[in-house]
Amino acid sequence: MPFKPLSVLPTAALTVALTTALTVALAGAPASARAETIRVAIGTQDTTINCATGGLLIRELKLLEKYLPRDGRYKEVRYDIQWKNFTSGAPLTSEMVADKLDIGSMADFPGSNNGAAFLKAGKRSVFITVLSGSTLGSGNGIVVPRDSKVTLLSELKGHTISVPFASTAHGMLLRAVAAQGWDPQKDVTIITQAPEVAGPALQAGRIEAHADFVPFVELFEHRGVARKIYDGAQANAPTYHGSLVSADYAARYPEVVVAFLRAALEADRLIAAEPEKYSLLIEQVTGIDAAVNYLYHGPLGLQTRDLTWKPEYRQALRTSIETLKLMGRDSPLNADSFIDDRYIRAAFKQSGLDYEQRLVNRDKLPLKAVDATTGRPITDVQRAAGIWVQGEPKVRHYASIENALADLRRIEAAGGKARAVYVHDLIHRIKLLAPTSWYAIDAKGQLSAFLQRDAAAAYAAANRGRVLDFAGAKAAGSTAL
């Protein structure tokens, strides 16, 4: 459903000094834009919550208006800002190719489709920034119905797996199937199914497994209809969501593109400082539970917001272009020319940020907190946990799962309720929803969390322990402290 254009805020004139990296783009720009109306039509994917800093937050907080150029060649310009929301990248791409949109955000795989579609139409689009991603591959995953006995991807041979067609999850699924040594045409049946259809189907047990992208795997888990058995991190295949722009538009209005990216950088700063506040805003706009939004956007999140073109993300795009061939969609698209980092580098410079410093930083958003039960700083996050208590503005943090679950028992005994409980997979270092995770308790009573039961069992066997589900872990953790 399209959003109404947002009004332009009356702000002071902004001096826009592009870096020398934009000289070529500026050389081809018109000498004057006086009395011109410039359309800034942006396609968003609001429910794809890791795109929030390139769409939803910019729109809701009116950040674009703050940075659009209003002096020099833009002194007399009127901006026609348009927003349109999509549930996936494919229809967004169609409207970009049809020149109904100028900028859009999507993942690496649908982004490669975007570039290929532009080339087929005799045009070009360029990938201008990453918004959020995982150098390991988290963000895509495979779930089964909550009560399914399937615990591993290998158990799905000969079965049916649904997935949103041409999505980044589709690309992940094809690569995961190939890694199993399976023929995707013979050893597994892959059918197309949108998230809004898959949710009820999982709940009713009408599908055996479903692959999806941010945030639906975790949303289905959180709402109790599914259980994740495979995370993209297991394939060690980097993935990201980012923003693209029509190359012609960027050449005509490079300062407008940089303004959009400066707005994205501010959105990133705001959500990093107050992840709970903006997770609630995302829930208000999209209906995606704040607990799931925080799983991605909070400290040590399942993905990391990152607006730099790390080598892993460049490789992710190359892999996505190669995956097109698995679908019979060969294209002359080249990742090196498809990515254009001049605009994001200029945005960093104008925002007083060091692009090169961020480029080499692979750390997740750090956790700077004290244990809610002991008051001591949390210095080792390997077994850190968190509880977002319903009605509380901030997540409580803990140095151990035992401390968290002991506190959870006290919260519930006092009539409180947890909006969410978070733990971290000991092997893959990814943030998990505690109720659907597996646990191993060792001989010393220390709890460790795992995505998969077999990993928990292996750890328990090696440490004279036993495997527990969440209920068992709660009972064990209640005796901590």
Protein language model regions, located:
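Conserved C-terminal helix/tail region of periplasmic/extracytoplasmic solute-binding proteins
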Residues: 324-368
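Secondary-structure end/capping motifs
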Residues: 47-49, 252-331
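A bilobed periplasmic-binding-protein/Venus flytrap-type ligand-binding module shared by bacterial periplasmic
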Residues: 58, 139-149, 239-255, 440-442
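Short cysteine-rich clusters marking metal-coordination/redox-active sites
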Residues: 371-374
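Short, glycine-/small- and polar/acidic-enriched structural segments
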Residues: 36-183, 189-192, 208, 237
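Ligand-binding clefts/hinges and TM-proximal coupling segments of bilobed small-molecule sensing domains
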Residues: 75-77, 160, 164-175, 180, ...
